[in-house]
Amino acid sequence: SFYLYKQVEQTAVFHNRDFLRCQMTAISTAAFLDSYFARIGYQGPVEPSLEVLQQLHVLHPQAIPFENIAPYRGDSVPLDLAAIVDKLIHRRRGGYCFEHNTLFLAVLQQMGFNVTPLIARVRWQVPAEVETGLTHMLLRVEIEGRSWFADVAFGSTTQTAPLEFVLDTPQTTPHGIYRITQTREVLSLQFQTRSGWQTVYQYGLAPASQIDFEIGNWYTSTYPQSVFLNSLLISRTQPGIRELMVNDTYTQRDNAGLSQRHQYKDAPAWAECLQTRLGLTLSREEAQELFLCVSQSQDAASELTGG
């Protein structure tokens, strides 16, 4: 497994430089980092250390919600960094994996971290016989000769800590236990549930290119059967709990797996929950429009859906 890792390491170095140059062309580094730190409430040192990565990784999904409002409404999801910064930071909205992890990648690289973007096949709650495409973005981060996987956006199963690249070893995070397994050249991220280990996604170590994410994003946001076009999914982590809105139903789950649920019957109360519990503020008109859509939806997604 580590032989494969070394094979792609040199390629990743050159790739990262190209990716960063494309993404940061028109954005001031200092202003970018300052605005991001203010958005997530980070006040620590600006250095490429494990401790800093861990702090950012827990703060990001607490402050910036995972949400798919744009594709659910039929809008495009641009992946250029300027658009993502405007949406997730300045307009204080959320997004899904390609948006969150593109932002996180740019932040880490500007802080001096050695980061490689990767792409994965989602397997969460997908039958083993069903094939899936490359529709999820994650990051590999090198710190002092050790490799870590960072991922701040997988819906209700989002990591709140980087995971070290060690195989078959349970790793405890603030929101659950994960492990990384390997079959041939394929790595699998698994999450421990009450019914056992469940595979979240599968991936390799070859660095992904921007075009890979553009293709995955286009498919995810336009394919008629995509969950992101058929159900509204909004989630956020808070200390000790995960919070999720699927259409009109809010679920709060603690680390023991205990949950409480409430289905909303009117737009004002629903919008207030989004604002106070999930950190997402909508205008009255937008809330009414979205609530009408979700309350009429016939395709209720599982409370555990991620993406």
Tell me what each language-model feature is.
Residues 24-94, 109-133, 154-307:
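Mixed-charge, low-complexity segments
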